[in-house]
Amino acid sequence: MSTDVTQLAMALIARPSVTPLDEGCQTLMGKHLSAAGFTLEPMVFEDTTNLWARRGTQAPVFCFAGHTDVVPIGDLARWHTPPFEPTIIDGYLHGRGAADMKGSLAAMLVATERFVAKHPHHNGSIAYLITSDEEGPFINGTTRVIDTLEARNEKITWALVGEPSSTYKLGDVVKNGRRGSLTGNLTVNGVQGHVAYPHLADNPIHKAAPALTELAQMHWDNGNEFFPPTSFQIANINGGTGASNVIPGNLEVMFNFRYSTEVTADELIARVLGILDAHGLDYDISWVFNGLPFLTGDGPLLEATKSAIREVTGYDTDPQTTGGTSDGRFIAPTGAQVIELGPVNATIHKVNECVKIADLEQLALCYEKLLEKLLC
């Protein structure tokens, strides 16, 4: 028989909230939170729906953070079940968003309801920061809510982001930090011409190749005990007209850094520009700052998370900083401690996304124990 957390997860999955749509997910969550004594503050910025909810007025503030939007379904023909008709098969809940991250949202709500029922006069405050713009351009979501909170000096002490952090079994990995992300959009300018008359043209591909090779082979830093060395990856290269007899007039290159706390974005930019200039390129470049690196070291949140997972699962978790970015990067700069704990991520963003029902039940227990350890 389905548990409360499973039923709630199914109700959320049934809402086709492909980013930046919310499709009523936050309204459903708000009903549960309002009944538990939370004050709701919807924040709508352009096409994005956000919810800030809080129970209590005192510090410390424990905040559950997450998103109601999901990625597109991909090829519908490859799904074994309709992606927005949640289905239970052999102990797994199938549907888009099951693992990323509507299962986590359901576990948060159930944990909160249970905790408040047992501890109606808990210490501090419990908050929720929920957005429908995590899988999209992340312009009008968590970052805008944080800006609003900062403007009125409303601080989060601890943030638990429900991203699917686990690798093989629930809680085997938590994320206690993330690398920074910096994207460069480079255009190398040349002169278009006929391939038979190269002296009348200037091939930007030939000119850029040595510089790109140097960038790809560059050792940026050694990393540290918490972060692997900084990674430079070329993501897209576009040049040419499609014809075999035309030298292109320009070359477009998109690349990305995932960088550690051993280097800053400004330092990376300076080194890239130095290499491009050293090769004598005529270029234009723009930068997109996707997020700063952050790290939550030993402290109340990490210790409580480790303890909660050990008590629920019987094994120790492994704090890591690997993987992509999350909305934790917008919360951490305020001074909050940030941890990501959620389901196994093996099927996220794939067709036939699913989550183990038993894991959702255990996740709710982990979240509840976290509240007990920090607010009791």
UniProtKB/Swiss-Prot annotation:
SUPFAM superfamilies: Bacterial exopeptidase dimerisation domain, Zn-dependent exopeptidases. Binds 2 Zn(2+) or Co(2+) ions per subunit. It catalyses: N-succinyl-(2S,6S)-2,6-diaminopimelate + H2O = (2S,6S)-2,6-diaminopimelate + succinate. Pfam families: M20_dimer, Peptidase_M20. Pathway: Amino-acid biosynthesis; L-lysine biosynthesis via DAP pathway; LL-2,6-diaminopimelate from (S)-tetrahydrodipicolinate (succinylase route): step 3/3. GO terms for molecular function: acetylornithine deacetylase activity; cobalt ion binding; succinyl-diaminopimelate desuccinylase activity; zinc ion binding. Zn(2+) 2 binds at residues 100, 135, 349. It is an enzyme of class 3 (hydrolase). CDD domains: M20_DapE_proteobac. Belongs to the peptidase M20A family. DapE subfamily. PANTHER family: ACETYLORNITHINE DEACETYLASE, N-ACETYL-L-CITRULLINE DEACETYLASE. Homodimer. This is Succinyl-diaminopimelate desuccinylase. It comes from Shewanella denitrificans (strain OS217 / ATCC BAA-1090 / DSM 15013). The lineage of its organism: Bacteria, Pseudomonadati, Pseudomonadota, Gammaproteobacteria, Alteromonadales.
